[in-house]
Amino acid sequence: MNALSKAIMAETLCDELKLNKPVAKEMVENFFEELRHALENGQHVKLSGFGNFTLRDKPQRPGRNPKTGEEIPVEARRVVTFKPGLKLKTKIEKIGK
């Protein structure tokens, strides 16, 4: 299975919308920059028909060093989670059948 990269996305924009390569690359970069910027500023990102990127604060918890068995605290942190939208879920489920 191949991965979808920014370069492939830019190529698709070139082919589908007849854009030149630098403009397509810039559009892809700007899209991801806006996503990153919103998340860095504590905003949730909702992409209709695709899904939602949300921020979740995880509290500090006890952890263990697997090599030594020593107990160490895992620091509190903020993580990004993705929840697929209904349309995306439905399409993926159909592919799996």
Curated annotation (Swiss-Prot):
Keyword list, A-Z: DNA recombination, DNA-binding, Transcription, Transcription regulation, Translation regulation
A GO molecular-function descriptor: structural constituent of chromatin
TM segment ranges: none
Any one Gene Ontology BP term: regulation of DNA-templated transcription
Disulfide bonds: none
InterPro entries in alphabetical order: Hist_DNA-bd, Histone-like_DNA-bd_CS, IHF-like_DNA-bd_dom_sf, IHF_alpha
Region (Disordered): 50-71
Pfam family, one: Bac_DNA_binding
Gene Ontology annotations for the cellular component aspect, listed alphabetically: cytosol
Role of this protein: This protein is one of the two subunits of integration host factor, a specific DNA-binding protein that functions in genetic recombination as well as in transcriptional and translational control.
HAMAP family named among the record's database cross-references: IHF_alpha
Similarity comment text for this entry: Belongs to the bacterial histone-like protein family.
Self-association and partners: Heterodimer of an alpha and a beta chain.
Alphabetized NCBIfam families for the sequence: himA, PRK00285.1
Protein name: Integration host factor subunit alpha
Species of provenance: Legionella pneumophila (strain Corby)
Lineage: Bacteria, Pseudomonadati, Pseudomonadota, Gammaproteobacteria, Legionellales
